[in-house]
């Protein structure tokens, strides 16, 4: 009897694991209205970039109608090590959409309104001030009172006035460095509570709600999730998003048994690719190998996750499905609609005079201008990562695309745009 029970448990475990690994099924592209022959342009161009020394390697996955029509690894993940489709990448700011979805799950539970001041949950943000004058010689500054408090919508839409440490302007870098505020990536020790409560006492750089000002907003959002849910951010994500969706390779800090699959972070300069020292100075400490940290404690909501192309495609397909995948509902369709709707009005993103993108709640939303230049339909949404990774969901064509690289700095950020016509020209 014991043998029968053990056999049954084994079979259940085996088939459960097998099923979880195949939530997304690979099919012939032709069955989904995509030309296999024309899709070869993707391979041809990526291989050419590798041959020219502009790229070490990449993985890409394309879904249409919930099916995998393309999933390949090209080039090398490290020196003389071929890239594989299950290689793990530092996804940097592609973390932001995931954290934004996690926060909106709490919104659906009635835990906050988008108009709530964040000081309701983090008192240090009460009575904010805005930078007025700054003296670069001694890093002193004066401030003026903010016109209003930061609200949850500001944090989710990057309009709070909070800046970025380490990779921001010279002024934000200096003020944050002096106050030991890091950029949230590559600095695994410390905690969200320590950093965000200090951040709340520092000046904003523009008035809340008046500009799109890319900054540490999603790190703040990560701490808000911890405060509101009562759970550490990493545990909340595992329980509420990663496990339900079958995202088995997405972490802030990788388990030891998965670390060998992490690709090297290359650098590019003078048309050459190289692997630099792990620890570099970037207006503060930055470790290229931060995902391998043992017992890391800083869960950067803005840039800290590592993942595979397949895992991220699961997340993208959930959004395309209106918040559900494989029988597990993460968000309602109504909430998804809020997330991917323009939340910044006519505010420009990084001086984008062509208004190529608008911003929702954690997602960039492409406009008609992008459709006219890159073939990607208006209303498609997604985000990119500092280390040259790219993701978008295209509701019109029922597509999800993830293009993973790990290069910083790179002379060819534009490959994220160049790959778009290569994909869309293959549609029948």
Identify the residue ranges that each predicted region occupies.
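Short, surface-exposed loop or secondary-structure junction motifs
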Residues: 129-378
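Active-site SXXK
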Residues: 43-47, 66, 89-118, 126, ...
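Structured C-terminal helix/loop/strand segments within mature extracytoplasmic catalytic/sensor domains
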Residues: 383-428
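Short, conserved phosphate/pyrophosphate- and ester-handling motifs at nucleotide-, phospho-/glycolipid
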Residues: 35, 96, 308
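Extracellular/periplasmic catalytic domains that process cell-envelope and extracellular macromolecules
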Residues: 54, 82-83, 113, 143-149, ...
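Short, conserved catalytic-motif segment at the N-terminal edge
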Residues: 23, 27-91, 111, 130-135, ...
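Bacterial Sec-dependent N-terminal signal peptides
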Residues: 1-23
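Structural recognition of the beta-strand scaffold that forms the well-ordered cores
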Residues: 59-61, 71, 154-157, 213, ...
């Amino acid at each position: 009897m014991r043998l029968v029970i053990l056999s049954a448990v084994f079979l259940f475990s085996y088939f459960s694991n097998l099923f979880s690994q195949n939530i997304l099924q690979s099919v012939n592209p032709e069955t989904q209205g995509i030309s296999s022959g024309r899709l070869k342009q993707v391979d041809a161009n990526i291989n050419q970039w590798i041959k020219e020394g502009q790229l070490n390697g990449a993985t890409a996955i394309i879904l249409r109608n919930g099916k995998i029509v393309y999933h390949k690894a090209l080039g090398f993940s490290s020196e003389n090590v071929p890239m594989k489709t299950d290689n793990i990448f530092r996804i940097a700011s592609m973390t932001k959409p995931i954290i934004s979805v996690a926060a909106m799950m709490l919104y659906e539970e009635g835990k906050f309104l988008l108009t709530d001041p964040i000081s309701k949950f983090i008192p240090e943000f009460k009575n904010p001030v805005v930078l007025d004058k700054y003296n670069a010689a001694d890093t002193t500054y004066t401030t003026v009172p903010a016109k209003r408090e930061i609200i949850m919508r500001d944090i989710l839409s990057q309009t709070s006035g909070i800046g970025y440490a380490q990779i921001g302007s010279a002024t934000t870098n200096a003020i944050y460095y002096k106050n030991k505020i890091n950029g949230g990536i590559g600095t695994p020790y410390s905690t969200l509570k320590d950093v965000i409560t200090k951040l709340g006492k520092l000046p904003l750089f523009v008035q809340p709600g008046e500009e799109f000002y890319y900054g540490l907003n999603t790190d703040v959002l990560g701490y808000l999730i911890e405060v509101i849910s009562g759970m550490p951010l990493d545990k909340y994500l595992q329980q509420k998003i990663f496990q339900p969706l079958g995202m088995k390779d997405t972490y802030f800090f990788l388990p030891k048994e998965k670390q060998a699959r992490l690709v090297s972070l290359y650098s590019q300069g003078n048309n050459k690719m190289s692997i630099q020292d792990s620890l570099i100075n970037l207006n503060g400490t930055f470790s290229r190998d931060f995902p391998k940290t043992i017992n890391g404690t800083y869960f950067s909501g803005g840039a800290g996750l590592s993942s595979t192309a397949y895992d991220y495609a699961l997340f993208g397909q959930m959004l395309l499905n209106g918040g559900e995948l494989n029988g597990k509902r993460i968000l309602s369709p109504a909430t998804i609609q809020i997330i991917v709707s323009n939340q910044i009005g006519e505010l420009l993103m990084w001086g984008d005079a062509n208004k190529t993108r608008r911003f929702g709640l954690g997602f960039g939303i492409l406009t008609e201008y992008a459709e006219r230049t890159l073939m990607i339909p208006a209303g498609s949404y997604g985000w990119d990562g500092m280390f040259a990774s790219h993701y978008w969901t295209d509701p019109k064509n029922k597509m999800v695309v993830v293009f993973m690289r790990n290069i910083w700095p790179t002379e060819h950020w534009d490959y994220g745009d160049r790959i778009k016509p290569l994909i869309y020209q293959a549609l029948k």
